[in-house]
């Protein structure tokens, strides 16, 4: 796409957020914490040290892991579209306001979501919603986040 050469590396699922204690302390003190941005380098423990790995952590799965570890009830994944769509870019395109985790799994099996784009967002949302009863994930546009939180837009993913 005119961006030159890119190195292909593994993208493992995050196993833990090493800084979770500090993040939790900040959250509990009322601070707004921005964490788990895209392109993070995963680390591995080697004795008392951490060593970087030749890999990159997916921001959606890292955010899901963080939300689970913080015992959050809601996970909001911000993206470039207002809602998740099936048949994206086709004449029968359909924007979804909500879907159960079972419906999401069915759409994923039908290859409705693009790998490296909407697919990891939906996968992370499903993982979060199924991790504990009562959890809901929201996927929406950054500029519509407030309306999404208020239930006016976005796609809600929940376990039925």
PLM-predicted stretches and their roles:
Residues 1-160:
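C-terminal catalytic "cap/lid" subdomain
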